[in-house]
């Protein structure tokens, strides 16, 4: 059992028969009332993100999640196909469970699958990934005041805002949690 007061990002727990991972947790106390915990959590079975509220001190069951490295092969539209790098066994995960993560996946990338007992739930990416810029408009002269940004397209099809100096063909570091530009990758 785990106390909701100890919630922090990355903690996995079971509630109402579903498995959740904490993305954010906010603790609040008002006057003489009881403390409350509001947690932004991801349902690992459905892939949906919800806000759950708990009265402080409530206990929930800890979910022991096994993580195993696998290589991303491809997506067939309905499922993503991953291969165990040791046994060469292939597994499928519904695209609906990994829609956000698909923005950062490229062929051959090593990811971790999350398993609860024998049930494969979803995948976990590194906090940051290096991806190549495939489309980047030229910087417009005179449009350089107040931290100018431009929208670029990555090799995975994901679009994000980057500084004006980023050009096509460059490799950049992107946060998989926020989808934001982190910096240039070392060449």
Curated annotation (Swiss-Prot):
Encoding gene per record: efp
Pathway membership: Protein biosynthesis; polypeptide chain elongation
PANTHER family, per the entry: ELONGATION FACTOR P, ELONGATION FACTOR P (EF-P) FAMILY PROTEIN
Annotated GO biological process: peptide biosynthetic process
Primary role: Involved in peptide bond synthesis. Stimulates efficient translation and peptide-bond synthesis on native or reconstituted 70S ribosomes in vitro. Probably functions indirectly by altering the affinity of the ribosome for aminoacyl-tRNA, thus increasing their reactivity as acceptors for peptidyl transferase.
Pfam families: EFP (PF01132), EFP_N (PF08207), Elong-fact-P_C (PF09285)
Location (main, coarse): cytoplasm
GO molecular function, one term: translation elongation factor activity
Species this protein is from: Mycoplasmopsis agalactiae (strain NCTC 10123 / CIP 59.7 / PG2) (Mycoplasma agalactiae)
Protein known as: Elongation factor P
Keywords: Cytoplasm, Elongation factor, Protein biosynthesis
Family of the protein in this entry: Belongs to the elongation factor P family.
Recorded superkingdom: Bacteria
InterPro entries registered for this protein in UniProt: Elong-fact-P_C (IPR015365), NA-bd_OB-fold (IPR012340), Rib_uL2_dom2 (IPR014722), Transl_elong_fac_P/YeiP (IPR020599), Transl_elong_KOW-like (IPR013185), Transl_elong_P/YeiP_cen (IPR001059), Transl_elongation_fac_P (IPR011768), Translation_prot_SH3-like_sf (IPR008991)
Cellular component terms per the entry's GO annotation: cytoplasm
Compartment(s) of residence: Cytoplasm
């Amino acid at each position: 059992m785990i106390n909701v007061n100890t919630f922090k990002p990355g903690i996995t727990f079971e509630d109402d028969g579903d498995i959740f991972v904490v993305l954010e947790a906010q603790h609040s106390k008002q006057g003489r009332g009881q403390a409350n915990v509001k947690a932004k959590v991801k349902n690992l079975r459905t892939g949906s993100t919800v806000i759950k509220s708990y009265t402080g001190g409530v206990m929930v069951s800890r979910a022991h999640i096994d993580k195993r490295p696998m290589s991303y092969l491809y997506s067939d539209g309905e499922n993503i196909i991953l291969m165990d790098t040791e046994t060469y066994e292939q597994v499928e995960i519904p695209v609906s469970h990994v829609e956000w993560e698909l923005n950062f996946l490229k062929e051959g990338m090593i990811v971790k699958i999350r398993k609860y007992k024998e049930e494969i739930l979803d995948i976990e990416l590194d906090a940051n990934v290096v991806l190549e810029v495939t489309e980047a408009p030229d910087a417009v002269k005179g449009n350089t005041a107040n931290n100018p940004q431009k929208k670029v397209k990555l090799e995975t099809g994901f679009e994000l805002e980057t500084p004006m100096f980023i050009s096509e063909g460059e490799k950049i570091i992107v946060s998989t949690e926020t989808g934001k530009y982190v910096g240039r990758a070392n060449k």
